[in-house]
Amino acid sequence: MSSVPIDSVQAAQQVVSTKIKDKSWIMPTDPAEFLQQIAYQSQLLACLHWLGEFQILACVPLSGSVPIKDVADLAGVPVSQLAHVIRFMATAGFMKEPRRGEVAHTPQSAAFVTDPSFLDAGIFLAQVSARSARKMAQNSAISTLMGGDGANNGSDFDNGELLKSTSESPRVQREVTAYLHYVVNEVSDTANLLAQLDWRKLGSSSVVEIRADRIYPASLVLTELHSTPRFTVQTFQEDSVEQGTAVTTTATTSSSFISKSSEEPSPKRIKPGITYQKRSLGSPQVVTDATMYVMRLERPHSTSVQRSILDEGQIVSELRAHLGVLKHNSNATLILIGPLLPEAGAIDAKAEMVVRFRDLSLNQLTSEREMEVGELVDIIGDVQDESGCLVVVNKLYSRTSSTVALEVRYELYNYRKG
């Protein structure tokens, strides 16, 4: 039997690779193609895991090619199996066979060698995340039999166990960190979403950004667009600062506000006119004359698998801390902004796919879930006093991410009835 010419093999691989990149292949409407895509992606993950476990990628030089047999001997795997894996992965643009019996890196596969964190993420995806996903039906059935509602699926790793394994194993910690960064992470769209607000009507009013990013608060971006409002950047103070107080610094001395950050702000990040403060979570808001309070809900970047925003109790604590301020200043607005599960069709399909994937992964790994927009609206409405309550008066969605902004005001009960 005559062998297939190598140029024909490469041509076939190019056709498949091009088809994979096409949106109709990624999101097929035909049931058979849908199943084929699932099977193909599953095999890609299995092969990536296999290549990683036997450290085969590191055995291939970053430039030039090497005989597949030499790589197989070095890694201690069968030549035939390695050849089949390489030829399959090549259909996705991951490695290539430039000449029959030789293997070389493509830019995609080379990145997994020059930056091992890509491989760390892939291994965690294959060994932990995908395994938990496959056991979702089984775990839900067990949860139901034990008297649960099946929502908390009895995952293999509850949050405590996963945190423990992460802290005890440097390898697991490295893999979890890479997985969170490359697979389930998305870029925050906070600054762009805030820019959609009508800043001109604020004039020289005061704006407070609560729980600002320590390194790059959104206020720095907003001052570039709108120089008139006076900005105050508040970060949660460290335990060493007395509970219930605020420590204020000016822009010229504000480098001290990054007390536990590994990175100090550069001079370019310091803007005249921005005041930096530290506050305790849930302590009374010390800036009482602001027109707008912007509270960021997302957690700081973490090395553990957990929901993207603060816990309900933490959110309620901050809402109550601002209840009096909003009550006594009818012009004041509180903006809650962060990653939330959107209402169906509210954001771009690709962005919704990412956030829905993150939600399911979180549930399968820890039995937790991301918070939905409707849940947060209900939480806000439950914060009240004898005269009125907090209400959501507007919602802003980012079309390209799960970032949502809710505009909140204090409303008197008799006003609502009227």
UniProtKB/Swiss-Prot annotation:
Biased composition (Low complexity): 245-260
Compartments reported by the entry: Nucleus
Keywords annotated in UniProt: DNA-binding, Nucleus, Transcription, Transcription regulation
InterPro entries: WH-like_DNA-bd_sf, WH_DNA-bd_sf
GO molecular function: DNA binding
Listed name of the protein: Pestheic acid cluster transcriptional regulator 1
Protein purpose: Transcription factor that, with ptaR2 and ptaR3, coregulates the expression of the gene cluster that mediates the biosynthesis of pestheic acid, a diphenyl ether which is a biosynthetic precursor of the unique chloropupukeananes.
Domain of life per record: Eukaryota
Region (Disordered): 244-272
GO cellular component annotations of the record: nucleus
Annotated organism of origin: Pestalotiopsis fici (strain W106-1 / CGMCC3.15140)
UniProt main location, coarse: nucleus
